[in-house]
């Protein structure tokens, strides 16, 4: 991580392959997003690291430097806490990943060459917090994206914390410790199924007990991490791979049964039917070690 501070503002040096407009195109796709606000190409968000609650504005200069400005007197005094915030931002935008091999592969790939050219500099936007990533995966199961965002907003505003600034509330995702103490009845006002409520509370309790953690999963290889996630009630292969991709940063994560992925392939290949799983496996052979990026770019084609 290369960064420094100027007058209490954090300045992060960006990798060569980075385009803020491409990333904002992804981040602004849903008006119901409750975890950040974007105005004039500036992201305002609360970054929570343990008990740290920092309200920051993130902007970019010439795709070379990322500027992180603290609002509302929320700049941590201790340098190690500011380092954790920089680390969070690196994970959020996947800044430590050299995308050169991905683009070398994509420019020769019949399916990826168009999205790789059109969305050059797009990163797989992450969800660094494991509980948030798992909840988002569960909330999105078998419903459309707009309704999933609505459920997330209800959940966050019912059980999360917030920082108020300039008359607006900026939200922190509910901590697993808080959700672990609830019952499905407590979530009844949120228009999710009882099953989803049970799944989310169950995940929170596994994390509260220490049985499940990001640190433990990160020490595993891909297959073991996938198996450990799938054995959790409410987590199937799709959700597991979504979390492996967006939180744990396994490059081979591949939600092969994803509806959006299937639809994107159908569009780009001008098919009059859905591609089969075997066809997708064959198409994806050149994507080895970059399946997560290939998936993310194919999703991006859809909006």
From Swiss-Prot:
The EC number of this protein is 3.2.2.21
Which major enzyme category is it? hydrolase
Q: Which reaction does it catalyse?
A: Hydrolysis of alkylated DNA, releasing 3-methyladenine, 3-methylguanine, 7-methylguanine and 7-methyladenine
A biological process term (GO) from this entry: nucleotide-excision repair
Following inactivation of the gene, the phenotype reported is: Disruption of this gene sensitizes cells to the alkylating agent N-propyl-N'-nitro-N-nitrosoguanidine.
Q: Name one Pfam family in it.
A: OGG_N
rRNA-binding among keywords: no
Recount the UniProt induction comment for this entry. Answer: Up-regulated by methylated AdaA in response to the exposure to alkylating agents.
Q: Which GO terms describe its cellular component?
A: cytoplasm; protein-DNA complex
Where do the catalytic residues lie? Answer: 258 (proton acceptor)
UniProt entry keywords in alphabetical sequence: DNA damage, DNA repair, Hydrolase
Give the highest taxon in the source lineage.
Bacteria
The molecular function GO annotations come to: alkylated DNA binding; DNA-3-methyladenine glycosylase activity; DNA-7-methylguanine glycosylase activity; oxidized purine nucleobase lesion DNA N-glycosylase activity
Q: Where is this site: Determinant for substrate specificity and/or activity?
A: 238
Q: Which Gene3D superfamilies match?
A: DNA-3-methyladenine glycosylase AlkA, N-terminal domain, Helix-hairpin-Helix base-excision DNA repair enzymes (C-terminal), Hypothetical protein, domain 2
- Additional free-text comment from the UniProt record: Overproduction of this gene renders cells highly resistant to the alkylating agent N-propyl-N'-nitro-N-nitrosoguanidine.
Report the family membership.
Answer: Belongs to the alkylbase DNA glycosidase AlkA family.
Q: What does this protein do?
A: Is involved in the adaptive response to alkylation damage in DNA caused by alkylating agents. Catalyzes the hydrolysis of the deoxyribose N-glycosidic bond to excise 3-methyladenine and 7-methylguanine from the damaged DNA polymer formed by alkylation lesions.
Q: What is this protein called?
A: DNA-3-methyladenine glycosylase
Q: Say which species the protein is native to.
A: Bacillus subtilis (strain 168)
Its organism's taxonomic lineage begins at: Bacteria, Bacillati, Bacillota, Bacilli, Bacillales
